[in-house]
Amino acid sequence: MGHLELLLVENFKSWRGRQVIGPFKRFTCIIGPNGSGKSNVMDALSFVMGEKTTNLRVKNIQELIHGAHTGKPVSSSASVTIIYIEDSGEEKTFTRIIRGGCSEYHFGDKPVSRSVYVAQLENIGIIVKAQNCLVFQGTVESISMKKPKERTQFFEEISTSGEFIGEYEAKKKKLQKAEEDAQFHFNVKKNVAAERKHAKIEKEEAEHYQNLLEELKINKIQLMLFQLYYNEEKINVLNTELEQMDGNLSVVKDTLSHHENIFKAKKKDYGMLTRQLQQTAKELKSVEAILNQKRPQYIKAKENTSHHLKKLDLSKKLITDNEKQCSKQEDGIRALVAELADLDRAWKSFEKQMEEKILQKGRDIELENSQLDRYKLLKEQVRRKVGIMTQQLEKLQWEQKAEKERLAFEKRRHGDTQGNLKQIKEQIEEHKKRIEKLEEYTKTCMDCLEDKKQQEEALKKEIENTKSRMSEVNEELSLIRNELQNAGIDNHEGKRQQKRAEVLEHLKRLYPDSVFGRLLDLCHPIHKKYQLAVTKLFGRYMVAIVVASEKIAKDCIRFLKAERAEPETFLALDYLDIKPINERLREIKGCKMMIDVIKTQFPQLKKVIQFVCGNGLVCETVEEARHIAFGGPERRKAVALDGTLFLKSGVISGGSSDLKHKALCWDEKELHNLRDKRSQLVQELKELMKTLRKETDLKQIQTLVQGTNTRLKYSQNELEMIKKKHLATFYREQSQLQSELLNIDSQCTMLSEGINKQQQKIEEFQDKIDEVEDDIFQDFCEEIGVENIREFENKHVKQQQENDQKRLEFEKQKTRLNIQLEYSRNQLKKKLNNIDTLKTTIQKGKEDIDNLKKTEEECLKIVEELMVKQEQIKEVLATQSSNIEKIHIQIEEERKKVLAVDREVGKLQKEVVIIQGSLEQKLLEKHNLLLDCKVQDIDISLVLGSLEDIIEMELTETESTQATADIYEKEASIQIDYSPLREDLKALQSDKEVEAHLTLLLQQVASQENTLLKTTAPNLRAQENLKTVRDKFQESADVFEASRKEARICRQEFEQVKRRRYDAFSQCFEHISVSIDQIYKKLCRNNSAQAFLSPENPEEPYLDGISYNCVAPGKRFMPMDNLSGGEKCVAALALLFAVHSFRPAPFFVLDEVDAALDNTNIGKVSSYIKEQSQEQFQMIIISLKEEFYSKADALIGVYPEHNECMFSHVLTLDLSKYPDTEDQEGSRSHRKPRVPRVSMSPKSPQSR
C-alpha cells in the first residue's frame, strides 16, 4: 500500500505563500502551540480530499484564502496539493484550487471533474463520503457517546448500505400497496362467493318447494332439530369465543402486570431523583446565603473605592488649577525679569548719551571766572526778586508730582483689579458648570432612588405577605399533622383489600352509571359519636356494593366468578324488600332512629339505608338501649353508642376492639382529604420559599439605595455649598471689584483734571519768573551770546538736574519691579508648595485606592466564585429537574399505558360477561327445547342418552346457579343425531337466515294444512341469478389471481433489495465485530479485555440500533456511559481502527485523539499505532502530548508568526536518527521521551 509523501499548500487559511509540509513518514506527528495552525493542516488535507466547505469551519469557500478572515485576502486564489507515492514508486498528484468562489480539481497536471477526482481517490483507497482516512478533533469522544441508532447510521455510511435506503423504502411501499390490493380483491371474491352461496340456497328453496308436502310430517322434528342444531352450534361458537377471550384476557392481564411493574420502578426512580433535587436545592440555598453576605461587602467596598476616586479626581483638578495659576505666575515673573533687564539697558544707554552731551556742551560754551561770578550775582538777584513765586512754583510742582504718582498708582490698581475680576469671572463660570453637572447628577440619583424605593416597597410588601402566608401555612400544616398523628390509622392496605378495590374499580368502569360503590363510601354518620353504633348495625352490609338493578348485580356476580374474585354482597335498588318506617318510634325520648343519624348526598340511596337500618334505634348508654329494647310492651332493635346491640329475639351483641377498628374506616375519607390538603400546603410552602429568596434582592436594593442616598447627600451638600457660599462669595467679590473699578476710574479722571489745572498754574508762574530773569540777565545773555539765561542753564545746570531726576525715577521703578518680583515669587512658591502637598495627598490616595481596589477585587473574586458555583449548582438543579421531568413524563406515559391496558382488560371482561350470559341463555334454551321434546313427545333420534334424563321442570334466569349447572352438565352428555335434518338447514351462515328459517318452520308447524298457502313463494329466477353470480365470481377470481401475482413479484423485488442491503451491511458489520475485539485487546495490551458489537434487530440490523460495549481489563462489565474518559477514548479508537480495517485507506489522519487519554493509555495507544504504522498503514496524528509524539518516526512542527495577521510556519524533524533505546530495554516505569533537545528554528540543520 502506498503512502502520502508531501502536502503543498498555497495561501490556504493561515499558510501564507507556498508552503511544503513533509515528507511524511510511516508514523508522523504534527505538533505546535495552540492557535499556531495545526488544525489547518487537517483542514488542508480534508479540503484536497474533496470535503465540503461546511465541514472546514468556514461559511463560504473564499474564506479559506489566507487573510480573508481579516478582510484583506493576500490573493484571489488558493490551492492544496498532496503527492501520493504507490508501492511501485509511481507518483500521483491531487490538487484542489479555489478560484473565483469555486473549486477546481486537478489529477496530475490535468483538470478533471469532481466525480473523476473522487473516483481517482477511491482508486487509492480514499472514500470521500465515508471519510475513512480522516478523524477530526472531537470525533473520538462523539463516537464513544453515539446512540445505537446513530451507530447504525455510521455503519451504513461505512458499508455503503445506505445507498439502498431509497430503493428499499420504495419497494417496501410498493409491496404494501400490492398486498393491500390483493386483500381487497380477495374480500371482493369472498363477498361474491357469499352471493353465490345465497343464490344456491334460493335455488334449493325453489326445488324444495315442490317437495314441501312430503316434509310436512317431519316438520316438528325438523323444527326441533333445526333449533337444537343451531343452538348447539351457537353454544360451540360461544365456548370457542369464550376460550379465545379468556386467552386474550390472560395476555392483556400479563401486559397490564408488566406495565404496572415498569410504573412502580419509574416511581421509585422518581422518588430517588426528587431526593437528589432537594439536596441540590439545599446546597443552592446555602451558597445563596453566603452570596447574600458577601455581595453587600463587595458593594460597600466598591462605593468606598468610588468615593476615594472622586476625592482623587478633585485633588487632580486642584493641581491642574494650581498648575495653570503657577504657569500664569511664572509668565508674570518672566515678564518682570525682562522688564528689569530692559530698564537696566535703558539706564545704561541714557547715562552714555548724557556723557556724550556733557562733552559736547563743554566744548560749546566755556565761561570765564569773572563771568561766572557775575552769573551767580545776577542769579542771586533773581532769587531774591522771585523768591515768593519760586516757592509757590515749587509747591505746585511737588503737588503735581504727588498727583502723578497717585495717578500712576491708581492705574496699576486698575490693571490688577481687572485681572482679579477676570479670574473671578472664570471661577464663577467653572462653578456654574459644576452646579449644572451636580444638578443633573442629583436628578439622576433621585430618579434612580425613586425607582429603587418603589422596587423596595414592592419587594417588602411581597415578602411580608409571603412571611404572613408562610406562618398561616405552617400553622395549618401543624394542625393537619397533629390530626394525622392523632388518627394513628394504618392506611397501608393489604393485598386482599387492594384486590377488592381493583375489582370494584373494574365494575365501575364496566357499568359506570349502574355501580355506585360500597355503602361505606356513600354515606356517613352525622357525628363521630355514632360511628360505633352505625358500624354495628350495618354489620355485613357495611362493605356491600350498591347497584341500580338486579340484572346488573347478576352481571357483576358473573364477572366475579370469571375473575375468581372473593364473594361480594350486592344491594340492588329495584330488588330490595324495604319495610315501612314506624314514625311513632321518633317520639320515644332518649333515643333516635338510626336512619336519622346517617346522611348521604345521593337521594336514591335512602332506600338502601332504610333497608339496612330498618326501625333500629340508637341510644346514648347501654342501660337506655336495654330499657328501650326490652322494657316496653313490644321488643325493639336498639344499639348503644359503644356498639352494644339488642335484637328483638333477645340476643345481645357487645362492642369489641375489632368493631372499633372497623369504625375507623369512617375517618378514612376525612384523612384522605387531610392528606390532599397537606400535599397542597407543602407545595404552596415550596413556592413561598422561592418567593422568600427575594430577600437577597431586597437587601441588595437596600444597599444600593443607601449608597445612592449617601452620594446624593454629598452632591446636595456640595451643590448647596457652591450656591450659598462659594458662588455668593465670588459674586460679592465681583461686585466689590466692579465698584472698585468705577471708583478707580473716577479717581483717575479727577487726578488727571487736577494735574492739568496745576500744569496751567505752573506754566503761569514759570512765565512770570522767566520775565524777571530775562530783564535781569538781558546784558549778560548778550555778552555770552545766548538768547536767554534759561538756554544756558538748560544746557549746563538744568541738564544735571534732569539727570538726577531721571536717575531717581529709574531707581523708583527698579525698586517697584523688584518688590513686585519678590511678591510674585513668594506667591509662586506657596502655590508650588500647595501642589506638592496635593501630589503627596494624591500619592497617598492612590495607595489607599490600590488597597481598596485590592479589597474590592478580593470581594468581587469571592462573589464571582460564589456566583459561578451558584450557576453550576443551578445547572445541576436544572439537569436534575429535567431528569425528573423526563421521569415524570415517562411515569405519565406508563400510567396512560396502564390505564389503556386496564380499559382493554375491562372491555375484554365485559365481553366475557356478555359471552357467558349468551352461553347461559343458549344452555337454558337447549334445556327448554329438550323438555318440550319430552313433554310433546317429539321423537328426535339420539346418539347417546335419553330424553327421560331431562328433568321435567322449566328453568328461568333466576334459578340457583348450582342447580342449573348440574342440569346443564347432564344435558351436555346427550348427543343428538342431526342426520335427519336437511343439509340446507345445516348450511345456514348468518343469524338472520337462521331466524328466517326458524320462523318459517314455526309457521309450518303451527299451521300444517295452510302451510302451502301461507308460505312465501320462492324466487323463480334463482337459476338465472345463480348463473349471473357465477360469472361475476369467475371475473373476481381472475382479478384476485392477477393482484396476487403482482404482490408476489413485488415481494421478490423487495427481497432482492433487502438482500443487497443486508449483505452490504452484514459484510461490514461482521468484519468489524470480528476485528474489534482483537484490536481492543491490542490497544489495552491485555487479552482479558473484551469489545463486542450486537445488533438490536438481527434480521434487519440496519433498521434498529447497534450496541457497543467494552469490558476494560480487571473490571466487570458496565455500560459505555459508566466508563472513564480514557476508557471511552480507547474504546472509540478500537472502533475507529476496526472500521478502518474494513475499508483501509493508505494513510490515516487523526486530530488530537490523545486529548482524553492519561499517560498509561497514551503509552498503549501510541505503541499500537507504532506497530500498525510499520505493518499496515501510514499514520499522521496531530498531538499535544509529548508522551505520544515521542513515539513518532518524524515530527512536523507548526509555529505562528504575527505581522498584520497571524501566519503559520512549518519545521520537520526526522526522529529515526534518534533510536528509542529505552523501548529496546523494555523500561516502562520511568520512560523519558526520545525527542532530541534541538532548536526548532528555520536555521536548524534538521529543519526543512
UniProtKB/Swiss-Prot annotation:
The modification N6-acetyllysine is found at residues 648, 713, 1032. Residues 163-502, 666-912 form a coiled coil. The gene is Smc1b. PANTHER family: STRUCTURAL MAINTENANCE OF CHROMOSOMES PROTEIN 1B, STRUCTURAL MAINTENANCE OF CHROMOSOMES SMC FAMILY MEMBER. Forms a heterodimer with SMC3. Component of a meiosis-specific cohesin complex, probably composed of the SMC1B and SMC3 heterodimer attached via their SMC hinge domain, RAD21 (or its meiosis-specific related protein REC8), which link them, and STAG3, which interacts with RAD21 or REC8. The cohesin complex interacts with the cohesin loading complex subunits NIPBL/Scc2 (via HEAT repeats) and MAU2/Scc4. NIPBL directly contacts all members of the complex, RAD21, SMC1A/B, SMC3 and STAG1. This is Structural maintenance of chromosomes protein 1B. GO terms for molecular function: ATP binding; ATP hydrolysis activity; DNA binding. The keyword Nucleotide-binding applies. Spermatocytes (at protein level). Testis and ovary specific. Not expressed in somatic cells. It is found in: Nucleus; Chromosome; Chromosome, Centromere. It comes from the Eukaryota. ATP binds at residues 32-39. InterPro entries: P-loop_NTPase (IPR027417), RecF/RecN/SMC_N (IPR003395), SMC (IPR024704), Smc1_ABC (IPR028468), SMC_hinge (IPR010935), SMC_hinge_sf (IPR036277). The flexible SMC hinge domain, which separates the large intramolecular coiled coil regions, allows the heterotypic interaction with the corresponding domain of SMC3, forming a V-shaped heterodimer. The two heads of the heterodimer are then connected by different ends of the cleavable RAD21 or REC8 protein, forming a ring structure. Belongs to the SMC family. SMC1 subfamily. SUPFAM superfamilies: P-loop containing nucleoside triphosphate hydrolases (SSF52540), Smc hinge domain (SSF75553). Keywords: Acetylation, ATP-binding, Cell cycle, Centromere, Chromosome, Coiled coil, Meiosis, Nucleotide-binding, Nucleus. Its main location: nucleus. Meiosis-specific component of cohesin complex. Required for the maintenance of meiotic cohesion, but not, or only to a minor extent, for its establishment. Contributes to axial element (AE) formation and the organization of chromatin loops along the AE. Plays a key role in synapsis, recombination and chromosome movements. The cohesin complex is required for the cohesion of sister chromatids after DNA replication. The cohesin complex apparently forms a large proteinaceous ring within which sister chromatids can be trapped. It holds the Pfam family SMC_N. GO terms for cellular component: chromosome, centromeric region; condensed nuclear chromosome; cytosol; lateral element; meiotic cohesin complex; nucleoplasm; synaptonemal complex. Residues 1219-1228 have a biased composition (Basic and acidic residues).
